């Protein structure tokens, strides 16, 4: 493709800094090269490269991605990406190289290896350094992540492991999690565990989150628990339970907050409940706030906001 000015002449895009991008294709119809060109038809720089060379297999899987400079060699500061695939097209390895061989990317990773089960579901992902040793991913502390699935293909377990292949916490503060799903495939319970398999410390990560949905799939209930069936205050949100209601169009009509005893409480903004009303066009016409006693209250000196719309649905 190419860019043209109002005079009909070729021009350089101010944001992209090139006048034309051209591609070539291999015998199977997959992109072989991409080049950014200036007004003279010569390679020019865009985001640190002048283009990319690709290699694909017969199935169209990308085997190599090489960012290049003006002379077609590897662009300065860039890396060659090489991928491997299994017989059904699952990517089993991603690795980066420079002109001297194996290299590290900006996340300090040379290679990522993926493992799949007979249903083509990814069951493990691990990261290696240039020596083939396990290394931690980015700023996280794990080198391996493993997944388990139910018969419907939902992820029921995620677990992290360090370079010593022992359980380790991710940055969020948990080492493994278990998920329970309803018949609609929505999570109704999520449990988090530490490196010893015990419920996480609530100050670090809420041990259990439970939720429920209406028949349309709208979330109507979400709560935090301690791993032993008791409600707790989520230190991140400041409440234990949130209940929501909806109309038949999926518009949220109310949100209300409750404490560990399932009694009305105020959220961090100071109100217990907020309600909404909608017109036939599903435009919100009213937003109001209420206290723990169920009576109208002021939020930023306002109890109720109303909205009006013209015949085109524009707010007026």
Task: Name the predicted role of every residue range.
Residues 1-316:
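Buried hydrophobic residues that stabilize the cores of well-folded domains
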């Amino acid at each position: 493709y190419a860019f043209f000015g109002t005079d009909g002449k070729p021009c350089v895009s101010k944001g992209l800094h090139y006048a034309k991008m051209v591609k070539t294709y291999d015998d199977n119809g997959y992109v072989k090269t991409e080049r950014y060109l200036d007004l003279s038809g010569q390679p020019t720089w865009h985001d640190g490269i002048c283009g990319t060379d690709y290699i694909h297999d017969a199935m169209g899987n990308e085997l190599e991605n090489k960012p290049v400079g003006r002379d077609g060699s590897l662009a300065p500061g860039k890396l060659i990406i090489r991928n491997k695939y299994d017989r059904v097209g699952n990517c089993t390895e991603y690795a980066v190289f420079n002109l001297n061989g194996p290299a590290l990317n900006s996340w300090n990773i040379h290679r990522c290896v993926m493992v799949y089960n007979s249903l083509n579901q990814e069951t493990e992902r691990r990261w290696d350094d240039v020596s083939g040793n396990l290394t931690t991913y980015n700023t996280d502390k794990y080198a391996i992540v493993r997944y388990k699935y139910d018969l419907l293909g939902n992820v029921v377990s995620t677990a992290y492991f360090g370079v010593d292949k022992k359980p380790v916490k991710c940055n969020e503060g948990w080492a493994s999690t278990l998920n329970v799903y309803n018949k609609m495939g929505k999570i109704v319970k999520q449990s988090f565990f530490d490196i010893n398999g015990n419920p996480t410390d609530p100050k670090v990560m809420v041990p259990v989150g439970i939720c429920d949905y209406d028949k349309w799939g709208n979330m109507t209930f979400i709560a935090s628990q301690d791993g032993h069936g008791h409600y707790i205050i989520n230190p991140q949100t400041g409440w234990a339970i949130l209940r929501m209601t909806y109309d038949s169009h999926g518009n949220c009509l109310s949100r209300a907050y409750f404490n560990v005893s399932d009694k009305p409480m105020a959220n961090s903004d100071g109100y217990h409940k907020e309600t909404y009303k909608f017109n036939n066009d599903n435009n919100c016409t009213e937003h109001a706030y209420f206290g723990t006693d169920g009576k109208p209250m002021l939020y930023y000196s306002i109890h109720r906001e109303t909205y009006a719309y013209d015949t085109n649905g524009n707010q007026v």
